UniProtKB/Swiss-Prot annotation:
Intrachain S-S bonds: none
Name of this protein: UPF0735 ACT domain-containing protein NT01CX_1681
Domain annotation ACT: ranges: 68-143
Source organism per UniProt: Clostridium novyi (strain NT)
Gene3D superfamilies: 3.30.70.260
């Protein structure tokens, strides 16, 4: 039985990220074939073929329905509301919200939501959240 892991690309050899980039170019039609996609991202065709069936982005090839994300938020009015608004904009559906009382002007919030109909990749959403004002920390806790 195969085992699957979710691993941050920061610790992987660069070739794995480039294979994902090539697959995205092919999926979106920005590259007409594997030769062109491989050339654009800077890998050999043999590297692409070697890893293409073993490297996937978080949502690619899976039937993930839910994500649980932890946030550490500055205690500023409207911060949680902006996060919830963004989840709604990308077709996420909130399932649970747990919020701790702010301590030292920061509150921990855990949100579980349905990601099956999201119109952006989860990675992109996490990046957006990390860059949002008054968001101190964002972490992916679980996916089902």
């Amino acid at each position: 039985m195969d085992k699957y892991l979710i691993i941050n690309t920061k610790i992987l050899p660069e070739v794995f990220g480039k294979v994902l980039q090539a697959k995205e170019l092919l999926r979106t039609g920005k590259a007409k074939d594997i030769t062109e996609a491989s050339k654009i991202v800077g890998i050999s065709r043999s590297s692409y073929y070697k890893y293409k069936d073993f490297v996937f982005s978080v949502l690619e090839g899976t039937h993930v329905q839910k994500a649980t994300i932890g946030f550490l938020l500055s205690h500023k009015a409207g911060t949680l509301s902006r996060i919830l608004d963004r989840i709604a904009q990308i077709n996420g559906n909130i399932l649970t919200i747990n919020q701790d009382i702010p301590v030292n002007n920061a509150a921990s919030v855990t949100i579980t939501f349905d990601i099956s109909n999201m119109v952006v990749e989860l990675n992109e959403f996490l990046r957006e959240m990390q860059e949002m004002d008054n968001v101190v920390k964002v972490s992916l806790i679980a996916m089902e």
